[in-house]
């Protein structure tokens, strides 16, 4: 819609991966279809050159593969033209130059790199004018505090609740914020086991690739 995504001060328990179309003719063709409300076909996507990360990258390979699998029964491994990049910066440079038609990355890639698009990456116009999102994955829940089901101590539900509440309360203090900032975390919420169904699917996908 002509605007770059904005960061938020609100706490989030997940992030998403996106499929980003670039300024090449093919990239703009795919973006135009999406903006017109048309469904992309597998042939549409397979006709593009993709810039991807290594197969262990959550946002740069695994979750985009799950997105493809859910819609087309395919993964990144099935694409005819998928080029592995050594960094997201490399993928962006390939996208800007037209070497790649689409790339996959963490969702805030444009927020982080809009300024560098023209100055350092080779874009010929503002990033918001040359790129567009054509796909968004399921949430990626990559940070959590977990417990072992084999622990006798953790069998006590009251203890688990008290421990969880302690982490939540500690993260709300200035001292706690300083401690948890080491992990780039700003707070905690109670989780839902169903939130991690996507991660279970990701693990199954990884097994199938081995």
Predicted regions located by residue number:
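A conserved helix-loop-strand patch within extracytoplasmic ligand-binding domains
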Residues: 1-57
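An extracytoplasmic/periplasmic, membrane-proximal ligand-sensing/linker region
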Residues: 152-210
